[in-house]
């Protein structure tokens, strides 16, 4: 096995925009700033919004439908 070919695996701190601090290990070598984490992501917090695209689909079908096809 070759020596000194693997990157250094060091402890880093990942800080989320919500203020949550996560200590982990990585080969990145520097601290990270996260946009979202498990504490503030809508999927994990239960604050999901359902996006209604029904109006867009109807508008698309109306715009690109072939006249007399129905």
From Swiss-Prot:
Q: How is the cofactor bound?
A: Binds 1 zinc ion per subunit.
InterPro entries on file:
Ribosomal_bL28/bL31-like_sf (IPR034704), Ribosomal_bL31 (IPR002150), Ribosomal_bL31_A (IPR027491), Ribosomal_bL31_sf (IPR042105)
Quote the Gene3D superfamilies the UniProt record gives: Ribosomal protein L31
* Pfam families named among the record's database cross-references: Ribosomal_L31
Q: Which domain of life is it from?
A: Bacteria
A GO molecular function annotation here is: metal ion binding
Q: Which UniProt keywords apply?
A: Metal-binding, Ribonucleoprotein, Ribosomal protein, RNA-binding, rRNA-binding, Zinc
- Cellular component per GO? ribonucleoprotein complex; ribosome
Per the UniProt entry, what are the Gene Ontology biological process annotations, in alphabetical order?
Answer: translation
Co-factor(s): Zn(2+)
Provide the binding site for Zn(2+).
Answer: 16, 18, 37, 40
> Does the record's keyword annotation contain Lipoprotein?
no
On assembly, the entry states: Part of the 50S ribosomal subunit.
User: What does the record give as the function of this protein?
Assistant: Binds the 23S rRNA.
Q: Which NCBIfam families match?
A: L31, PRK00019.1, PRK00528.1
Q: Which family does it belong to?
A: Belongs to the bacterial ribosomal protein bL31 family. Type A subfamily.
What is the recorded name of this protein? Large ribosomal subunit protein bL31
Organism encoding this protein: Cronobacter sakazakii (strain ATCC BAA-894) (Enterobacter sakazakii)
Q: Lineage of the native species?
A: Bacteria, Pseudomonadati, Pseudomonadota, Gammaproteobacteria, Enterobacterales
């Amino acid at each position: 096995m070759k020596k000194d070919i693997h990157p250094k695996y060091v402890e880093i701190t990942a800080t989320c925009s919500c203020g949550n601090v996560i200590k982990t290990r990585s080969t990145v070598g520097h601290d990270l700033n996260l946009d979202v984490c498990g504490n503030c992501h809508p999927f994990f917090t239960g604050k999901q919004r359902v996006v209604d695209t029904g109006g867009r689909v109807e508008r698309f079908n109306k715009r690109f439908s072939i006249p007399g096809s129905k």
